[in-house]
Amino acid sequence: MLFGGILNITFRNFRKNLISSLIKVFGLALSISAVIVIWAYIINENKYDKNVPDSERIYRLDAQWGSMPAFLGHIINQSLYGHVLSTRLNFLTDAGIQVNNIPYNLKEMVFADSTFFKVFKFNLIEGDPREALARPFSIILSESNAKRLFGDSDPLGKIIRLENQYDFTVTGIMKDRPYLHFKTGVIASLSSMEQIRYKGVLKEYDGWMYPTYIMLPEDVPAEISKKEVLDLIKKSEYTEDFNFKPFNDIYYSPEIENESNTKHGSILYNKILISISIFILLLAAINFVNLTIADSISRSKEVSMKKIQGASKIHLVSQFMIETIFYIISSLIIAFFIIWFFNPVLYSVAGMSVQAGNLISGNNIITGTIALFIFVLLTGMYPAYHLSAYTINSSKIISAGRSSHVRIRNGLVLFQNIVAVTLICCTLIAFKQFNYMRKADLGFNKRDIVNLNINSQMEDHLDLLKERLMKYPTIENVSYSSRIMGSYWGSWCCVNIEGKENKYFNNYVDADYLETMGIKLKEGKSFSRENLSELKTTYLINETAIKQYNLKDPIGHVILPGNGIKGTIIGIIKDFHYRGLNYAQTPLLLFYTDNHLRYVNIRIDPAKTAESLKDIKTVWDEVCPAFAFEYSFLDQTYDLQYKSEKRFENLLFVFTIIAIFIAGIGLFGLSTFSTGQRTKEIGIRRVNGAREYEILKLLNKNFLKMVVMAFIVAFPLSWYAMQKWLMNFAYRTDINIWIFMLSAILALIIAFISVSWTSWRAATRNPVEALRYE
C-alpha cells in the first residue's frame, strides 16, 4: 500500500512538472543509450583473440618486424618439435580462384604449416585437424566461404583451382572466426609453396614474409622455453634482437613494420570512449539532481504537510529514492528503444550494432547492476536529502536557498560546462586532423583510378590487355604494379650502397606507372619504352632514400638491391605517401619489370565512370575470361587505412552532441531553479519599471560567467590532451586559436539558448502573478 501510494505521488508529480520530467527522462535515456553503445563497442573490441584455447602459451616471434624468414620456423619445427610447437603463415591477397569453372576472387588467403591446428586448437566442423594441412594442395574453408563457393552441397573433397593452374582439395570446414587479428576464411597448406613458387622456398634464410607463432610447453617455465628458442636462433647466425609477443597482446599492440595482414585495435581510442561515457553519465546525473531540485520549489508544501502528518525523514528519503528509481527505469526502457531504432544508423556510423546477446553475460550483468546501483545513489541521495530537509513552514522555502546548496549546484553545472567545452574543442581538433589526413597532398593523384587484380598466369596477356583498354576514349592511361597505394607494401628489403646495407620498400612497375599515378619526377629520367632491354638494371629512388642514405649526386650511382641485380639510379621521384599519413616517409625504390605484377592501374575519364567500367569489363572478359572481374577504386582503397579513425570520428561527434545537449539541459535546470527563487524580486523590479532586456541581463549574466569560467579551465585541458593525441600521427595538423574561439562561440550560443527560454518567460510574466500572495 505504501509503495503504491508513493507511485501515485510519483505519477502525479510527473504530470504536474511534465516538461521538466520529460527532459529528465529523455536526458537520462540519451546518456544511458550512449553509455550502452560505448559499452557494446568496447565489448566487441575486447572479443579479439579471445576463446583461443591455451592462448596464454602462444606467442608471435618478432624482431623489428612482425614476420620472420621461412628458415626460422623450419629449424624450430625440426629441432624442437614435440617440445615447442610453431607454425608459419604466409598471406596471399586478392587470389583468383575457380570452382566448377566459375571464377571468384578471394580477398585474403592464408597458407599455414601442418602444425597450425596444434598451435591453434580450433575444431573443424568437417575434416580431421591433424591431417587437414598435412599434404600439399590441401585447403580449409570457413563456413561462410564454403556456402559462398559450394552452396548447400558438401564441399569436402571438392576441387578449388588457384590462378587457373593449381588444384587444391577441400580437406576441412571450420567455423567463421571474425575476431582474430588475422583472417582464417581460407587456409591452405604451406607446403604447396614448394611447387607454387620454387623448391626450397620454405627453407630460405632471407625473406621476412612469414609471421611465426609459437606455443610453449605447459610443463616447462616459459622463460626456459623462450631461451631455448633464442639459443637455437643465435646458432643460425641471425643478429636481430628477437622477442616473444604474447598472442593476447597483439591486437592492442602498436603496429610494427612488415606485420602482414594483422588487424589492430586502439587501446587509446577505447580509453577515450570510456572516459567520454563516464563523463556523459556524470553529466546526466548532475542534470537529474539540478532539475529535481529545481522542481522542489513546487513541492515544499507537500513535504511540509507530510511532516505535519508525522512522516519521518527516512520515509521521505525512501519516497524520493523510489521516484529516482522510477525515472531511471523509465529512462533505461526508452534508452533500449533508442538503441533499437538507431541500430542501422549505428552500423553505418561505427561499423557495429548493439546485440542483446553480446551484452548479456554473467560479468556484464554484474557490472551493469553495480553501475546502476551507484548511479541511483549518485542521482537520488542528494535530491532526497535536500527535499526532506524542508522545514514545516509551508509558505516559504527556508533551506532550499542556502548558500551551500547554491554553491554545490553552481559547481556541478560549471563541471558540466567544462566537460562540454573540452569535448567541443577536442572534437574540432580531431575533425581538423582527420580532414587534414583526407585532403593532404599525397604526392600522387588517387582519384579516378580503377584497380584490377592480376596474377602470374595473366602475364602473357598484359600487353594485349593494355592495348585493348587504350582503344577506348573513356580510358586515359593504364599501368601495372606489384603493389597499390594504401595496401600492404611487404617487408623491408636491403640495398647495398658503397658496402653499407640500407633498408627500403619497393614496388615493381611498368614504364607508364609515374604518368598514370601522377607521381612527379624531381631529377633525372623515368623508365622509357625506348630502352626496354636496359630497364631491368635501372632504378628510381625517392627523396627520403637520398636523405637517409646520404647520397651525393645520386643520378648514375650504382647500387645492389635485394633482387640481386646491380643497377644504376636513373631518376629521383618526389616523395609520395604510398601509405597513409599515420606513417612517416620511408626509402622507396621503383623497379621496372614485366613480371611480379599484381595490379592493373587504370585512369578513367571522371565524367564517364559508369561507361568506363563497362568498357573495362568488356575487355577483361575478352582477354581474361577465366578470372573473375572485380574492381576497386584507389581512393576508396586508400581511405580504408583510416577506417578506425573515421569510426572514432563519427562516435566522437555523436557523443559530443549528446554531452552538449545534456550540459544544455543542466543550464536549463539551474536557470529554472534560479528564476523560480527570484520570482518575487523579478516582480518588484518590473513594477519599478525594469525593462525586459534588463531582466534578461540580470538572469543570464551569471550563467554566461559560468560558461566563461568553463572556457578558462577547458582550453588548456583540451590543448594538452590533443597535443598528446596528435603525437600518434607522423603528419599532423596545427592547433589554431580559431578552434578555441569557435568552441567559445558555440558554447556561448548553446548556453544562451538553454537559459533564454526560462529567462524570457520570467521577464515577460505579469508582475501581478509574482506578487499575488506576498
Locate predicted features.
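A hydrophobic alpha-helix feature that marks transmembrane segments and, especially
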Residues: 36-39, 276-303, 378-384, 655-682, ...
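Mid-to-C-terminal secondary-structure elements
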Residues: 113-125, 139-265, 464-640, 644
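Intracellular coupling helices
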Residues: 5-23, 27, 286-327, 389-400, ...
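Small-residue-rich transmembrane alpha-helices
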Residues: 33, 37, 325-390, 432, ...
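Membrane-helix entry/capping segments
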Residues: 1-7, 12, 16, 52, ...
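Membrane-proximal extracellular/periplasmic loop immediately following the first transmembrane helix
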Residues: 38-96, 205-215, 226-228, 243-253, ...
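Generic structural signal for small/hydrophobic residues in well-ordered secondary structure
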Residues: 14-17, 24, 45, 61, ...
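Short, strongly hydrophobic transmembrane alpha-helices
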Residues: 17-44, 409-433, 444, 666, ...
